[in-house]
Each structure stands twice: as C-alpha cells, then as structure tokens.
Regions:
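Acidic/histidine-enriched ion/cofactor-binding microenvironments in catalytic or ligand-binding pockets
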Residues: 77-86, 109-123, 210-224
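Short, electropositive alpha-helical surface patch
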Residues: 64-80, 106-115, 144-152, 212-213
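Solvent-exposed alpha-helices and their adjacent loops that cap or buttress functional pockets
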Residues: 4-7, 23, 46-48, 90, ...
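Charged (often Lys/Glu-rich) extended helix/loop segments that serve as interaction or gating elements
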Residues: 113, 128-270
C-alpha cells in the first residue's frame, strides 16, 4: 500500500556523468553515473517513479555551448539502450556570466545548441525540458564592497576573502570586475594589477586576480567587486569571527554585463 502511494507522487532523476571539459569549475568528479550504470538505474526507477527524469551537468561557468549538445547526446544513447523515454530531461546549470577574463558567447547560442541537441534525439514527442540557470541569471545583481586594510606594493589586504563572499576568487581563481569607490578623492588613471589577501589567519585566504585598479589605491579605500549575485552571500562563513551581514539594495548598473552589446571594455583583461 505504501509503495502504491509513493508511486503516485515520486519523481526520480538519474544524473548522467558527462564531460566538463569546457567548464571553469569541474563538477563531474562527485556526481553522475556513466551511461551503462545510468541505463540500469533508469530501468529500476521506472518501476517506482511517477515521473522519471534524466539529468546532467556540464560544469560551472561553461564557456562553450557544445557541451550541452554532447550531454543531450549521452541522454539519447541511454534512451536508445533502454527504450525508455524519460518524462523530463534536465540539462542542468553551467550557464555562464561575464568576467574580465571570461567572455562567453551570447546566451542565445547556448539555447540554440540545446535545441539542436534535442532535435537530434528524433523523438516523436519531447519530454519536459528544464534547466538550472545560476550565474547567468543572477551574478550581475550583486556586488561586494571591501575596504583596503593594508597595501604592500601590489598586494592588497582587504576585509573580506575566500572564507567570505569571495570564495570563487580563491581556488577557482575567478577574476571579478573591480573598481575603486572614489569618495571624493582623485583617482589615478594609471592602472596596476593587484593580488588580494583576506582578513583571516589562513594563508589560503588569497586571491590571485589579477585585479586591475588605480595605481594610487591606498589604505581605507573602498573597492566594489562585481558579479557576486551568484555564490557570494551563500559562501560566507564565520571563520576567525569575520562575517558581514550588511546588505543594501541599490539601483545602479552592474560593473559588467553580458546582456548589453556595448560591454564595458575597460574592465576586460587581455
């Protein structure tokens, strides 16, 4: 009786392992079943699920749309092997945003590649298609404001870091667009590349950059770091007691945008 009730409501997804070769952050090592395993899981899930889905993830900040077509092709191989057409296909996340050294193709090219891959499945009726836009949807909506606590030549020690909102600037080495908040003082037109160091005791609290800022930046200056609407607030910890929960809503434009043909070229890194 319990199994019958579950059968009426249960939605199961089998996550398929696909290549993350074009992603800045590889998410393929922990999750995902190879094609032969996924086929067996799909057959098993068919016995119990009300809705059955296949999903994949091409990795975070995917820089080439072809990855989605390749993922859909793997889905097609599983469908051919099992003769089971899923109710849902989830093409996952990975949709990119723009950073100074990472300029993706227009978002429409990603959608075109997905549609092409789905068409190549040659199914009489397509399943429901879902996706998980993250960075591409919300990255531009948030910034972090940091204070320069100390300058040592081209090293800036700031009051946030990899244990705070700037995790992606650490190990993945994402370079955020940056600009000094002038606050009434004269800012040099000469630019210099800087490394950042966070406030904690850990030497890993380091952000290589390069972060391009005016040469005359000094202690107590404030810097805006953009593209932190995704994975900024969610990564904060209270390690060493450093934690900021001050959030303000403003209505100015983002430092960079991928949804405007006139991209702000002064923030791009060659």
């Amino acid at each position: 009786m319990k199994a019958q009730i579950t059968r009426k409501t249960l939605r199961l997804f089998v996550r398929v392992s696909v290549s993350n070769e074009h992603a800045e952050i590889d998410l393929s090592k922990k999750f995902g079943a190879i094609t032969s395993e996924a086929a067996g899981l799909l057959r098993l899930g068919k016995q119990y699920a009300y809705k059955l889905g296949l999903s994949f993830h091409v990795g975070s900040q995917c820089m080439h749309p072809i990855s989605y077509a390749k993922g859909i092709s793997e889905i097609g191989n599983i469908i051919k092997r099992t003769k089971i057409v899923p109710d849902i296909i989830n093409v996952g996340g990975g949709f990119p945003t723009i950073y100074p050294d990472l300029v993706p193709q227009p978002m429409q090219s990603y959608f075109d590649e997905i549609n092409k891959g789905l068409k190549n499945l040659k199914l009489e009726k397509l399943p429901e298609i879902i996706c998980e836009p993250g960075r591409s949807l919300v990255a531009e909506s948030g910034s972090t404001i940091v204070r320069v606590n100390l300058r040592k030549k081209q090293k800036l020690y700031i009051n946030d870091g990899t244990y705070g909102t700037l995790f992606d600037a650490g190990t993945p080495n994402i370079v955020y667009p940056s600009r000094v908040i002038k606050n009434g003082r004269v800012i040099s037109k000469k630019l210099t590349s800087f490394d950042f160091y966070g406030p904690t005791c850990d030497s890993m609290d380091y952000m290589k950059g390069p972060f391009i800022l005016p040469n005359n930046i000094k202690e107590n200056d404030y810097i805006e770091l953009g593209q932190l609407g995704a994975y900024g607030l969610t990564f904060r910890t209270q390690f060493n007691g450093f934690y900021s929960d001050q959030i303000f809503e403003v209505e100015d434009d983002p430092i960079m945008t991928m949804y405007n043909k006139e991209t702000m070229k002064e923030f791009l890194v060659a």
